[in-house]
């Protein structure tokens, strides 16, 4: 497609830690409404790639083009860019001191400056989508791994980002919980959400692409 449709374009991305080259000359793009799966074994640099895209790690070379601009340019507003990227981590990274609703509103209120009422309405919309609306008063420690990850997905959705990055979203889950998270991800993919998924699981790719 033409460049307007690319949400993120990675060009010649390199990342080294000392003399150890983890990423070498990586090129790919994520189009609006597309789901890109990066599949590889643990330790193959997949998570490093995501950490470079959301600038938790600074790439050693190359470009990350977002809306036509290289966000690695010094003048770029990294903070603003980061708010446009949703992130779902392997370990959920929920705020343990907040209940489920609070987890899904705190970023909206602090970063997007939404009112508490608006933030709660948005959060409820996405908690319903992931099937967690009846747990709004629960603390993370009261939830199963699958429930925590569904809350983490709702939290990312509540920021209404341009793309959501998923870093091994099912690898910390007990096998019987993987299905409920994949089901939510499949529904989101079918709804036209732009997603970049790093996983060592063929299961999600099979579900998504139907092979």
Regions found by a protein language model. Give the residues of each.
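Helix-to-loop junction immediately C-terminal to a conserved catalytic motif
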Residues: 54
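Conserved ABC transporter NBD signature motif
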Residues: 62-73
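Conserved ABC ATPase "signature" region
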Residues: 70, 105, 116-135, 183
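ABC ATPase NBD coupling module
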Residues: 71-86, 116
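Conserved ABC ATPase signature
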Residues: 139-143, 147
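A short, proline-enriched helix->beta-strand linker immediately N-terminal to the Walker B motif
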Residues: 158-162
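Catalytic Walker B motif of ABC-type/P-loop ATPase nucleotide-binding domains
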Residues: 164-167
């Amino acid at each position: 497609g033409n460049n307007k449709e690319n949400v993120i374009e990675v060009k010649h991305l390199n990342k080294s830690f000392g003399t150890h080259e983890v990423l070498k000359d990586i090129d790919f793009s994520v189009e609006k409404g597309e789901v890109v799966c990066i599949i590889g074994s643990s330790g193959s640099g997949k998570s490093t790639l995501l950490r470079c895209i959301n600038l938790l790690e600074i790439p050693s070379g190359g470009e990350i083009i977002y809306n036509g601009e290289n966000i690695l340019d010094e003048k770029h507003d990294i903070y603003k860019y980061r708010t446009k990227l949703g992130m779902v981590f392997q370990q959920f990274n929920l705020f343990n001191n907040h209940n489920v609703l609070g987890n899904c509103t705190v970023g909206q209120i602090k970063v997007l400056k939404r009112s508490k009422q608006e933030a709660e309405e948005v959060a409820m919309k996405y908690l319903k989508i992931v099937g967690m609306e009846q747990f709004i008063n629960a603390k993370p420690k009261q939830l199963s791994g699958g429930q925590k990850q569904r809350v983490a997905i709702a939290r990312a959705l509540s920021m209404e980002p341009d793309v959501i990055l998923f870093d091994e979203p099912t690898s910390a889950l007990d096998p019987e919980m993987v299905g409920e998270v994949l089901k939510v991800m499949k529904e989101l993919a079918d709804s036209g959400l732009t997603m970049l998924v790093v996983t060592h699981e063929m299961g999600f790719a099979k579900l998504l692409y139907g092979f």
